[in-house]
Design a protein with these regions (language model features):
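Signal peptide-directed extracytoplasmic domains
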Residues: 1-161, 190
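Bacterial extracytoplasmic/cell-wall-associated proteins, especially those involved in peptidoglycan
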Residues: 97-101, 115-336
Length: 336
């Protein structure tokens, strides 16, 4: 049970409880003084159905008010906040912290049950990326699948607002450049995901948006970050996105909280240092801004970017220019 305010008590009434069982639970928690009085009131007022769920009661509530709340089903809702960039692992921990069940149980749904998105993302290997960031109100009686479904529903709503999904039937719009440069020189391990089919366009956009989301929290930079990655895809240059390594290690259960140079060789299709093209799935839940950036990247010839001391990024067209930006960042960090 969650922490309850002073003078208030949580009571969980499970499906199938009889009126007498409900009265006994209320009495044992100090909500009512007499089980018989509650039962008598219930039957004198046409025996209205009492709803299962978790309730938060004031110790001083009247019998009439208590009965009416149960008849209306005024259950208690727990707030679960999902910020932009949360992974399914983060969401699972947030649900557990709210007292709504175990993180492990939520992950079982998020990692395997793709039926919730089968019509819009048939190639998805999990719900990662489609559990939309927002503030949710969940009751204790909701299943993990119902919670996941609420997040997917919000994704669909926002995706329609921005034109990523064109209709309730699931027709999708593409994001980013439509083709790869046919004259580019391939690099090892390039994958077929570089040229998505129409059915893969939404999935590609969500994958790209998730990388953009994890790379920068500065909304106005996101279209530029998107342009860097789309330019690299067109030229068949590996994305080299550090957040993809972190996610690869999260999936493997080996992430220690920090990246080291050796991690760039971590063997996973999600590691965009080792595998060219997009990873096989999103690496986080992108927010609206990141989705829009993935759909509408800036038109640039940038191929590199690095953080600066102010929390923004410096963009570069050549490796020489990029190396100068990296050196400037390191000098700034040493001077702090």
């Amino acid at each position: 049970m969650p922490n309850q305010p002073s003078g208030q008590t949580f009571v969980l009434l499970r499906p199938g409880y009889s009126t007498r069982h409900i009265a006994a639970e209320l009495k044992s928690n100090g909500i009512i003084r007499s089980e018989d009085a509650f039962i008598l009131w219930h039957y004198l007022h046409h025996g209205r159905s009492l709803k299962a769920g978790e309730y938060l009661f004031e110790k001083s509530g009247s019998l009439v008010d208590i009965h009416n709340r149960l008849a209306r089903g005024d259950v208690y809702f727990h707030t679960v906040v999902v910020p932009d960039g949360f992974t399914m692992f983060d969401i699972a921990r947030a649900i557990e912290a709210a007292g709504l069940g175990s993180a492990e149980d939520f992950l079982k749904i998020a990692r395997t049950d793709t039926t919730l998105i089968a019509d819009i993302a048939p190639g998805a290997n999990s719900l990662e990326g489609y559990l939309f960031p927002d503030t949710y109100e969940f009751s204790r009686m909701m299943t993990m699948q119902e919670m996941a479904a609420a997040m997917v529903k919000q994704f669909r709503q926002v995706a329609r607002q921005i034109g990523l999904i064109q209709s309730p039937g699931g027709e999708t719009a593409g994001g980013g450049p439509p083709d790869v440069d046919a004259n580019a020189t391939p690099i090892p391990e390039v994958t077929a995901r570089l040229v998505p089919t129409p059915d893969e366009r939404l999935e590609r956009t969500v994958i790209m948006a998730s990388i953009i989301e994890k790379e920068t929290a500065v909304a106005e930079e996101r279209p530029q970050v998107a342009s860097v990655y789309y330019n690299r895809l067109q030229k068949r240059i590996a994305l080299d996105a550090d957040p993809s390594i972190i996610y690869a290690e999260l999936l493997a259960g080996t992430y220690t909280g920090a990246l080291h140079h050796d991690d760039m060789q971590f063997n996973s299709p999600y590691n965009t240092y080792r595998s060219a093209g997009l990873p096989p799935g999103p690496i986080a839940s992108p927010g609206k801004s990141a989705l829009e950036a993935a759909m509408h990247p800036s038109t640039t010839d940038y191929l590199y970017f690095v953080a600066d001391a102010a929390g923004h990024h410096r963009f570069a067209r050549t490796i020489e220019e990029h190396n100068k930006n990296v050196a400037a960042y390191r000098r700034a960090m040493r001077g702090q």
